Amino acid sequence: MARRKKGDAISGWICLDKPYDLTSTSAVSRVRRAFNAQKAGHAGTLDPLATGVLPLALGEATKTVPFLMDADKAYRFTIAWGRSTTTLDREGETTDSSDVRPTREQVEAVLAPFIGEIDQIPPNYSAIKVDGERAYDLAREGVEFELKTRKVKVHALRVTAAPDVDHLELEMECGKGTYVRAIVRDLAAALGACGHVDQLRRTRVGRFTEQTAIGLETLENLSYEARLSEALLPVETALDDIPALAVTDEDAFRLAQGRAIVLLPRQVESLKAVLTPGDRTVSAMSGQRLVALCEMRAGSLNPVRVFQLT
């Protein structure tokens, strides 16, 4: 006899405004407790010292996490000039110092090479694995290692304010795997200066934005008032860029059983018109209910992820 899962069968997304000095794992645990959810996860780690958008998946929404991991992101951050650190942020130990204080104009003059597809070496204090171990664990233990250069995409990088000679505020829009701390490290080097990230806030992950994010305390207060449903977003929120196809009740039943369905010629043509080249992923919907994520092959839809939603 199968063991009954602990918690409630709640499914959906939470757009959390993660507070300062809280790990992403701890944020997941607190939200899971608030909802008494059977299962929870997050779509992309946010450093403890960073604040902002942390999309959290509950229940069946965890099946859609991989689709959000590839989404574009946006950040707002502050550079503090004068000191380089081990962690590339204000919490690290000083590795170098300088009296150089780049002006706004000087920074803007060197931004162009940091926009587009660029080569970036991730910070040693990162979650990247090295021979099966997290880089940040090796760094804390004093183990010497080198991370490989990776290709990342920066869609936009702009200076937004220069509050004083020691600080500069910027905004960045980028693809997955781009590290703000590495951008600041390399920007300071290009200017012959020392600098680190003083403040960091993620403002967007895909369609999840800071304007719709909810604070952790607010969420926990809703839990006490039995109003958590007000903060819960549909499972398909993370699938905004994936074409949707309405299916009949009969086809929905077949897909739920893991069986393929045959598409009408007009359905094939309509999907081809919206699918990007090389992409065959389609979400099958029965009314407002997500039935399955499917792959379109030879005029049929083959279920890849089936959702148990009511």
Curated annotation (Swiss-Prot):
The active site is at D47 (nucleophile). It holds the Pfam family TruB_C_2. The keyword Nucleotide-binding does not apply. It comes from the Bacteria. Its EC number is 5.4.99.25. It is an enzyme of class 5 (isomerase). GO terms for molecular function: RNA binding; tRNA pseudouridine(55) synthase activity. GO terms for biological process: mRNA pseudouridine synthesis; tRNA pseudouridine synthesis. Keywords: Isomerase, tRNA processing. The keyword Isomerase applies. HAMAP family: TruB_bact. Responsible for synthesis of pseudouridine from uracil-55 in the psi GC loop of transfer RNAs. Belongs to the pseudouridine synthase TruB family. Type 1 subfamily. PANTHER family: PSEUDOURIDYLATE SYNTHASE TRUB1, TRNA-PSEUDOURIDINE SYNTHASE. This is tRNA pseudouridine synthase B. It comes from Caulobacter sp. (strain K31). The gene is truB.
